[in-house]
Design a protein with these regions (language model features):
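Short, hydrophobic/proline-enriched secondary-structure or compact coil segments at domain edges
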Residues: 1-7
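C-terminal extracytoplasmic interaction modules
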Residues: 16, 21, 25, 31-307
Length: 307
């Protein structure tokens, strides 16, 4: 047997692929190096003119800045489940036959929990990772239908909430043959029953990474069970798939949770709202609003002048 490290690909110029560290601010330039970071393996597949999409997609057509953030998240060190640590996500695979580019793109993206999105200018990528709220929406922002409903809620089907996952991955401890990692949620099995899903972890050669992939599927399906549907005006054009938003629905909360600001007095630091509000007698009250940079911020309320 012999071990093939794989291709030398283009990686950020400020990136050390051996130590998986980044120095300074990236200027956008690239350098050749060996790397199994899935973000830059994807970049190589999309931009290489011989075996990739390089003859149809130029470097300017792929959002390398989004891949840079994704690559940093993949390189973060996490417990491997056996007392040590390892990168969160690595990619070790080879393509032995010609396939449709969309299928290959989906396999590459599945290795780092992201999806491709064409934003009108470039092919960018949205990853499921912790992020800040992009924008809050209240009842005053949405279009009300003929029934007087602005936010419409629905839930996932019980059959779509898997409680056990069998993850197939390439196991170095098994002669680089396929092994299966079983991931279960005992509490969910007691509540919903055993609902098994079988999946392949493309490019995965780590048992710990395979376990995390199965655990992510279980937690996502058990915790993200509710969806909300609503209609916006032109302000909704600011979003791309994957943006995290905040819903302040008065009907859902059973109290007034949002509205509009009519005027701002900067000298007295006073906000005039479109309705009367009552602050709780105890605790700290805050107001969520959009600052001058177009980002949501949370500000403490220090006083409530009489209307």
């Amino acid at each position: 047997n012999y071990h093939i490290r794989g291709r030398i690909i283009q990686v950020p110029s400020n990136y050390d692929p051996e130590k998986r560290t980044y120095s300074g601010i990236w200027d956008g330039s690239l350098k050749p190096a060996y790397s199994n970071n899935p973000a830059w393996c994807l970049w190589d597949m999309l931009t290489h003119p011989r075996y990739g999409m390089g003859k149809r997609l130029g470097a300017a057509d792929v959002d390398k800045w989004a891949l840079y953030a994704i690559g940093q998240y993949c390189d973060q060190t996490v417990p491997d489940g056996f007392g040590g640590t390892e990168p969160r996500m690595t990619f070790n695979a080879y393509l032995s036959q010609q396939r449709k580019v969309w299928d290959v793109l989906g396999d590459f993206c599945s290795a780092m929990r992201c999806m491709p999105v064409w934003n009108g200018q470039t092919l960018t990528f949205v990853q499921d990772r912790p992020s800040d709220v992009v924008w809050p929406y209240t009842n005053s922002d949405v279009v009300v239908d003929d029934n007087g409903v602005g936010f419409r809620y629905s839930f996932s089907a019980l059959k779509d909430r898997h409680t056990a996952v069998e993850v197939n991955y390439t196991d170095p401890q098994n002669g680089w043959q396929t092994s299966t990692e079983l991931v279960e949620d005992p509490e969910a099995i007691l509540r919903y029953g055993r609902n098994l899903l079988k999946m392949d972890a493309f490019g995965c050669t780590s048992r710990g990474q395979a376990h995390r992939a199965g655990l992510w599927v279980i937690k996502t399906e058990l915790l993200e069970t509710q969806t909300v549907d609503f209609t916006l005006g032109s302000q909704g054009l600011r979003h791309t798939p994957g943006d995290i938003i905040e819903i302040c629905d008065n009907d859902y909360a059973g109290t007034l949770t949002g509205g509009r600001i009519l005027s701002i007095d900067a000298a007295s630091r006073t906000l005039t709202l479109d309705r009367e509000v009552t602050l709780p007698e105890a605790g700290t009250s805050t107001v969520n609003l959009i600052n001058g940079s177009g980002k949501p911020v949370r500000v403490d309320i220090t006083a409530h002048p009489a209307p």
